[in-house]
Amino acid sequence: MTWNTPKPGEWKSEELSQGRIIDYKAFNFVDGEGVRNSLYVAGCMFHCEGCYNVATWSFNAGIPYTPELEEQIMADLAQPYVQGLTLLGGEPFLNTGILLPLVKRIRKELPEKDIWSWTGYTWEEMMLETPDKLELLSMIDILVDGRYDKSKRNLMLQFRGSSNQRIIDVQKSLQSEQVMIWDKLNDGKESYEQVKRE
């Protein structure tokens, strides 16, 4: 499989991010558990072969993240039927300049909402990363980690594309200092039926 692999701390959000997003999708059911609002940031350095979202690789793609968009995200997230926010891309952890203030605001104003994020970093790589990435990680509930590996593609997997990726309970993992898999993981027929419906 081909993708880029950084040395610890090599890719810095403050050097790469242009403060841009590819898309914002409110009220969807595909990017994690429950009804979610999904923010797709611009820019990714991993460049996984077979990536379904190649259009997000450029840090100059999309549109600027604005205060107006943030207000819309907060208003949508405040709806009682919305479970939480999902961060995707692109690579969320290379866009900490826009995501850290947003996530801090959510934790302060809407603490009952959960936050999911996808990342190309593995948990083990993340533990060696820069303080901004670790701060963002500390405020996330669920992390889907690891590069997409086309050779391990599996449509039966819940919320991920290849079997090397994990759905990690971040808070339990940080407390126990070891990877703790999300306790609602449900790979198999039910996931396959969901994928077919999409």
Where in this protein do the model-derived segments appear?
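Conserved, mostly hydrophobic/aromatic
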Residues: 39, 91, 143
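Short pre-active-site segment immediately N-terminal to redox-active cysteine/selenocysteine motifs
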Residues: 43-47
